[in-house]
Amino acid sequence: MADLFALTEEALAGMDIELVDVERAAMGLLRVTIDRVDGVRIEDCEQVSRQLSHVYEVENIDYKRLEVGSPGVDRPLRNEAEFRRFAGERIEIKLREALDGRKVFSGTLRAPEADGASGQDDTAGAGKAVFGLEFEAKKNDIQVLSFTLDDIERAKLDPVLDFKGKKR
């Protein structure tokens, strides 16, 4: 069987849809997570579902149910393009190795800075982009953690949501 992620990504080419994840779950569920720059609408999910149903049938992909949805407000970040896209947003990262006894950090993501002389991004070693994370180490003590994608175990958006709404 072909790589399911690659097959799905190819099927969505030209649809202005970003494939975030393809996951097999219990009882034959195939869960496909998509995103768009301007947000995922129900019509996008319907269109992707119809397209993938046809492709999966032709390719003999075994599943009982297909679920297509958005990654939600706490979407995972998995590659450099996603980290660059969400620079300036609040994220949470978990490091592979603890730093000062701590692995999980939340703060504002910084994109790699361009070197004034060469116009190239900061890199660590073999051309790996170095991102920054502004976080509050102690009250009113903002620090910046520098990291590459190899340094992290996982990352996700970590927005601050206001559920208070309007008062009556």
From Swiss-Prot:
SUPFAM superfamilies with a match to the protein in the record: YhbC-like, C-terminal domain (SSF74942), YhbC-like, N-terminal domain (SSF75420)
InterPro entries given in the database record: Ribosome_maturation_RimP, RimP_C, RimP_C_sf, RimP_N, RimP_N_sf
Transmembrane parts of this sequence: none
Highest taxon in the source lineage: Bacteria
Keyword Cytoplasm among UniProt keywords: yes
One GO cellular component, as annotated: cytosol
Gene Ontology process terms (BP): ribosomal small subunit assembly; translation
Alphabetical keyword list: Cytoplasm, Ribosome biogenesis
Subcellular location: Cytoplasm
Similarity remark: Belongs to the RimP family.
PANTHER family found in the cross-reference section: RIBOSOME MATURATION FACTOR RIMP
Function, in words: Required for maturation of 30S ribosomal subunits.
HAMAP family registered for this protein in UniProt: RimP (MF_01077)
Protein name (database record): Ribosome maturation factor RimP
